[in-house]
Amino acid sequence: MAVSGLSGIESMLQQMRAVVQAAQSNGVSPAELAPQPASFAAELQRSLQRVSAAQIAATNQGKAYELGAPGVSLNDVMIDLQKSSIAFQTAVQVRNRLVAAYKEISAMSV
């Protein structure tokens, strides 16, 4: 049984090596395969989109519960509402800290 497990791992390793070799033969360098660092603005935008999506999902689930949709429990609605509330509060705190940092930097003399 252990031998079959090892042969499965070896076959997976061979497949992974083949994929890497194919990528390198197509002119793709390992540096291009590595994820690129995200900019602060892009990360902030993705975070705001996640907060918005959480709020929309919680609102939709609340409406579904109000309409009596099957499979939607009050527990799930309350948990989603709390998740969206925490996400929004976190976003507000990040905004407040960014504003405070901007004010501090703008008050510095050059």
Curated annotation (Swiss-Prot):
The parts of the chain that form a coiled coil are: none
Q: What's this protein's name?
A: Flagellar hook-basal body complex protein FliE
What's this protein's family per the entry? Belongs to the FliE family.
Q: InterPro entries, from UniProt? A: FliE
GO terms for biological process, alphabetical: bacterial-type flagellum-dependent cell motility
- Cellular component terms (Gene Ontology): bacterial-type flagellum basal body
Q: Does the keyword Membrane apply?
A: no
Establish whether keyword Electron transport is in the entry.
no
| Species of provenance | Bordetella petrii (strain ATCC BAA-461 / DSM 12804 / CCUG 43448)
Whichever gene encodes this chain, its name is fliE
Give a Pfam family name. Answer: FliE
